[in-house]
């Protein structure tokens, strides 16, 4: 599909947190689908600034900026939009808890892949192929 046939580009950043072969996912209030935690950047924000802000808003933890490392950039068509997700790993401080905008947190293995959007599935595939996601 060419860019002319796809609507807007949704440019996001996401935090990849894997423990025991599972990746942390969040389901926002009012949504049925789980996402890798993160979100859209505000004007003038870097990926790192967006990541730190979004994770603090969604999960009430503080990412350690000096530990932010790129994982990869993934792109997929989702409905009428093209979604680009820049993924990063980072250490954090605090206790993982869902904020008021998040209905549920879950640790997903590869078998839960159908419960996430197309762009997240690309990351799931790569992590599974590398043996990081069970």
Predicted regions and their residues:
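Conserved Nudix-box catalytic region and its N-terminal flanking loop in Nudix hydrolases
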Residues: 18-58
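A short coil-to-beta-strand element that immediately follows conserved catalytic motifs
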Residues: 62-72
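Conserved N-terminal beta-strand and adjoining loop/helix that marks the start
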Residues: 2-23
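Short loop segments at secondary-structure junctions
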Residues: 20-22, 91-95, 110-112
